[in-house]
Regions:
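Nucleotide-activated donor-binding/catalytic signature segment of Leloir-type glycosyltransferases, i.e.
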Residues: 317-337
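Short hydrophobic beta-strand element within catalytic cores of glycosyltransferases
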Residues: 371-374
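Acidic anion/phosphate-binding donor-loop and adjacent secondary structure
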Residues: 236-239, 255-270, 319-321
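Aromatic "clamp/platform" in nucleotide-sugar-dependent glycosyltransferases that forms part
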Residues: 354
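Conserved acidic donor-binding segment of nucleotide-sugar-dependent glycosyltransferases
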Residues: 386, 390-397, 406-411
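Short alpha-helical donor nucleotide-sugar binding micro-motif in glycosyltransferases
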Residues: 341-346
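A short, well-ordered alpha-helix in the C-terminal region of glycosyltransferases
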Residues: 413-426, 435-438, 442
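Conserved donor-binding/catalytic core segment of Leloir-type glycosyltransferases
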Residues: 272-290, 296-299
Length: 446
C-alpha cells in the first residue's frame, strides 16, 4: 500500500502505526530520512497552479515535496488542464461539462461538498491506484468532490490525513467566514443561516446548514486527521468547534523571497503617481468583506500629495471608483515584476479586510519592504509588529487614516529593513512548506 523505492511495496508504516517493535520503527525512520524508503503524498484542492492562492500553494508544495524525494500527487477540481508530462501525478476531477452541472446543482441545494458522486468514484479509483501514505486536503468545499464519499473512503482505508484550513468552512454548516455576520452558531449547531447568499453562495429554498453541520461533525469524527491553520486565529477557533479534539498546528503561508523583494521600478511614472505618497491596496474584487467601503471612502480623505492605488480590479470596476485624481485603479499587473514594483514603490500597504485568514498580500508587501496597516481581524494582524506596521480596530475609518498618516510621516525608510527581515525569517516559502514535510514524517512515525 505504501510507496517504497525499488518497488518495495510493503506495509511498513502500517506496522509502525500498529505499535511495532521500537528498534524496527527507528530503523524505518532512518531509512526514510536517507530516502531509502520514500512516501507518497496526495494533495486534494479546488484549484491548481494558477487557480488563486490555494492553487498556487498546492503547486508550490508539490514542487517542494519532489525536491525532498517525496512522490507527490495532486487531484484538483477544475480550472487547469494537466500537461502531458504531468498526467501521471496531476489529476483533474471534473470536466467542463460536469463543472457547469455541479455548479448549478450545488447553488440550488446548498450542499457544498455533497454532490459529484460520479466524479468522486473516479477519483477514489485513482487513489486506489497510487496508494498514498498521506492524503493532504486543502479546500474540499465548492462543487467538485463528494466530501462524504471521500472522508468515508479515507476512514475505511485508515489513511492518515492532513487538512489545511484556508477558511472556516470545515466546522460550519455553510459559511467560509462568520466575522462579518457575527454569527456564532457554529459553536453549538448551525441553523437558520444568515449567510446563505455569501460565499459559498446558495439559492436553496430550504436552509441546508443544519444538515451540513451534522454531516461534517459525523464524517470528521473517526478520521486520523491533523488540521493545519495558516494563522493562530483559525487554530484557536478550531479548538472551540466540534473539531476541538483533533490536533491543530500552525504553519504560516509563505512567499518566494527570490520573487518578492525590494526593487526599483518605473510604475510611478507609468501610472502617473509621480512623487506623491503612494498608498497601495489589493482590491479583493471590491467585496464588502474585503473592505470595499473603506477603500472607496479613503480617497476623499487624502491630501493632495497622497494617492490610493488599487490593484486587482475586475473588468468594469474602475467605474465604481470616486471621480478624483487621488485614486488610481489597475485591473491586473501586467507582469509579476510590475506587481513587485507596485509593492516596492508603495509607501504603505493597507488591508482593511473585515474577515480573512492569513492574507498572502500582507506577506508579499512585507517581503518587498513595505509596512502594513490592517484591521484587527482574523489572522491579518498576526504579521504586523510595531516595526512593520500598525493594527487598527476593525471598522475604524478614522483609525485607518491616522495609522496611514503615522507611517507616511515617519517615512518608509524606517520600516524597510524590519519588514524584509521578518518576511525572510517567518514567511520564506521554502522554510514554511518544509514544515509540512516534517509534519508528514511525524504523522507516519506515530
Amino acid at each position: 500500500m505504501y510507496g517504497m523505492k525499488q518497488d518495495l511495496h510493503t506495509n511498513y508504516w502500517v506496522y509502525i502505526r500498529a505499535g511495532g517493535n521500537k528498534v524496527f520503527e527507528e530503523f524505518l525512520i532512518f531509512m526514510f530520512k536517507y530516502q531509502i524508503i520514500t512516501m507518497k503524498v496526495l494533495q486534494i484542492n479546488t484549484r491548481y497552479y494558477n487557480g488563486g492562492s490555494t492553487g498556487r500553494i498546492t503547486f508550490d508544495l508539490k514542487k517542494v515535496m519532489e525536491a525532498n524525494g517525496i512522490e507527490s500527487y495532486v487531484a484538483f477540481g477544475f480550472g487547469y488542464n494537466p500537461k502531458d508530462n504531468e498526467k501521471d501525478t496531476v489529476y483533474r476531477i471534473e470536466s467542463d461539462r460536469e463543472l457547469f452541472i455541479s455548479k448549478l446543482w450545488t447553488k440550488a441545494t446548498g450542499h457544498h461538498g455533497f454532490n459529484n458522486k460520479c466524479e468522486t468514484r473516479r477519483l477514489l479509483a485513482w487513489i486506489d491506484e497510487i496508494k498514498p501514505d498521506i492524503i493532504h486536503m486543502h479546500n474540499i468545499h465548492n462543487h467538485y468532490v463528494n466530501v462524504r464519499m471521500l472522508l468515508e473512503y479515507i476512514s475505511t482505508k485508515n489513511i492518515p490525513c492532513v487538512l489545511t484550513m484556508h477558511d472556516c468552512w470545515t466546522f460550519t454548516g455553510h459559511c467560509a467566514y462568520f466575522d462579518y455576520s457575527g454569527c456564532e452558531k457554529w459553536k453549538t449547531g448551525c441553523n437558520h443561516c444568515p449567510s446563505l447568499r455569501d460565499y459559498p453562495k446558495t439559492f436553496a429554498p430550504i436552509d441546508p446548514s443544519s444538515w451540513n453541520y451534522k454531516m461534517k461533525k459525523k464524517l470528521f469524527a473517526p478520521l486520523n486527521i491533523t488540521f493545519v491553520s495558516p494563522s493562530q486565529w483559525l487554530c484557536d477557533l478550531q479548538k472551540q468547534s466540534f473539531l476541538k479534539d483533533k490536533p491543530c498546528v500552525v504553519i504560516n503561508n509563505g512567499v518566494d523571497m527570490s520573487v518578492f523583494h525590494p526593487i526599483k521600478s518605473n510604475v510611478r511614472e507609468e501610472y502617473g503617481i509621480g512623487n506623491r505618497k503612494m498608498i497601495l491596496a489589493v482590491a479583493g474584487g471590491l467585496a464588502t468583506r474585503k473592505g470595499k467601503d473603506y477603500l472607496l471612502k479613503l480617497p476623499s480623505l487624502l491630501n493632495e500629495d497622497e494617492v490610493l492605488v488599487l490593484v486587482g480590479l475586475k473588468k468594469g470596476q474602475e467605474a465604481l471608483l470616486p471621480t478624483t485624481n487621488k485614486v488610481i485603479g489597475i485591473q491586473r499587473s501586467k507582469t509579476p515584476d510590475e506587481l513587485v514594483g507596485l509593492y516596492s514603490e508603495a509607501d504603505v500597504f493597507i488591508n482593511p479586510t473585515l474577515e480573512d485568514n492569513f492574507p498572502t498580500t500582507n506577506l508579499e508587501a512585507l517581503a518587498c519592504g513595505t509596512p502594513i496597516v490592517t484591521f484587527n481581524t482574523g489572522g491579518s494582524a498576526e504579521v504586523v509588529t510595531s516595526e512593520t506596521g500598525l493594527v487598527v480596530d476593525k471598522g475604524d475609518m478614522d483609525g485607518l487614516l491616522s495609522a496611514i498618516r503615522t507611517i507616511l510621516n515617519k517615512g518608509k525608510e524606517q520600516y524597510v529593513d524590519a519588514c524584509r527581515k521578518k518576511a525572510e525569517s517567518d514567511y520564506n516559502k521554502e522554510i514554511q512548506y518544509g514544515k509540512y514535510i516534517e509534519l508528514y514524517k511525524n504523522i507516519l512515525s506515530r
